[in-house]
Design a protein with these regions (language model features):
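Class II aminoacyl-tRNA synthetase-like tRNA-binding/catalytic domains
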Residues: 1-108
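Generic short alpha-helical hydrophobic face used as a protein-protein interaction/packing hotspot
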Residues: 63, 111, 147-148
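A conserved active-site cap/scaffold subdomain adjacent to cofactor or substrate pockets
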Residues: 98-136
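Single conserved hydrophobic/aromatic residue that forms the stacking wall/gate
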Residues: 142-150
Length: 150
């Protein structure tokens, strides 16, 4: 069973995420109503389906492809974000990774790895997540230079 999310915490978190990205000129995209196989870009074995209007569609796993679509269609925009519900039909879910049904906040933006890293640092600071936390410090170790050396 998927754990219930306390509404006050959910609202506060979404308000913070939305305000951060809106203040940077990002636009919100509603992806849940876009019937397409673009809603499922994960492992095909984990895609659940539903029938709608006589056709079979994947239950959404991600809005990522739609965000990329909007970014390509609107190159003048600094970026796009979405809030969606992700459905994962994982036969053996990895403990601690995510639930099989969960809310997801995603964003796509212009730029490369360095711009992304800077945006994520600013987001952590905005959310009050100390950069000294082990998980953030570990992420910062994976720079584009480190990837080139691998």
């Amino acid at each position: 069973m998927t754990k219930l999310i306390e509404p006050k915490k959910y609202t506060k978190t979404l308000d913070l995420l939305r305000s951060f990205f809106l203040s940077r000129g990002f636009l919100e995209v509603h992806t849940q109503n876009r019937l397409s196989i673009l809603a499922a870009c994960e492992d095909p074995e984990t895609v659940a389906t539903y029938e709608y209007n006589g056709e079979i569609w994947p239950l959404p796993q991600t809005g990522q492809m739609w965000l990329e679509y909007e970014l390509l269609k609107n190159p003048e925009a600094p970026g796009f974000f979405c809030v969606s519900t992700s459905y994962r039909q994982e036969p053996n879910p990895v403990e601690g990774r995510h639930e099989v049904i969960f809310p997801m906040f995603e964003f796509e933006m212009k730029g490369g790895v360095e711009e992304l890293k800077q945006m994520e640092i600013e987001l952590c600071e905005y959310l009050g997540i100390p950069l000294e936390q082990v998980n953030v410090k570990t992420c910062l170790l994976y720079t584009s230079d480190a990837a080139d050396d691998a």
